[in-house]
């Protein structure tokens, strides 16, 4: 029915990574934002790990990414390696170096989350309590003690002027033309 593969972000990122091995891959949008940490997947009826690990992407820009994507682009343009971009609010990164994680709330390990509903609920509660852009804290989710997925605090919201600029862009304000009947 649809034209996208299931788990489109994972499929497309892995194809990009296979072809362009060292190209930075930054993902965003609804699929990446909702799957940035361990999450329940209705299609497979399982708790799945962060999309960052399954996709092979380097960073997630979650939520409203207008600020974070510009900061990421500026950092890359300044010559900062994508693996060193660990400081931008509204992003998620992965690391094997526990020392890179500071001032953060530890979530239950993925193996514990996928086996224990209470641990999953506790993890979700900590995530929920840290969604406010003014008081949200950095979170990290261990994967077997060797890999860590780190969610930086949420990005600050757009100002009224910035919001007006976004909505003044020439959007079609209509559904995509591919849905037109032939």
What do the predicted segments below correspond to?
Residues 1-144, 151:
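Glycine-rich beta-alpha loop elements in corrinoid/cobalamin-binding modules
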Residues 124-182:
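N-terminal [4Fe-4S]-dependent radical SAM core
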């Amino acid at each position: 029915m649809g034209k996208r593969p299931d788990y489109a972000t994972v499929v497309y990122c892995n194809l990009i990574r296979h072809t362009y091995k060292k190209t930075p891959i930054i993902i965003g949008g609804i699929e990446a934002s909702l799957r940035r940490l361990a999450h329940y997947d209705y299609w497979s009826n399982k708790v799945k790990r962060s999309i960052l690990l399954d996709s092979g992407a380097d960073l997630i820009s979650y939520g409203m990414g207008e600020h974070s994507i510009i900061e990421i682009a500026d950092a890359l343009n300044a010559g900062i390696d994508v693996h060193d971009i660990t400081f931008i609010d509204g992003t998620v990164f992965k690391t094997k170096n526990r020392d890179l994680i500071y001032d953060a709330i530890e979530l239950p390990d993925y193996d514990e989350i996928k086996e224990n509903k209470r641990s999953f609920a506790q993890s979700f509660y900590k995530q929920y309590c840290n969604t406010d852009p003014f008081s949200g804290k950095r979170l990290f989710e261990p994967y077997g003690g060797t890999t860590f997925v780190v969610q930086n605090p949420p990005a600050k919201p757009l100002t009224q002027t910035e919001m007006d600029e976004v909505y003044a862009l020439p959007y079609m304000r209509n559904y995509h033309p591919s849905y037109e009947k032939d």
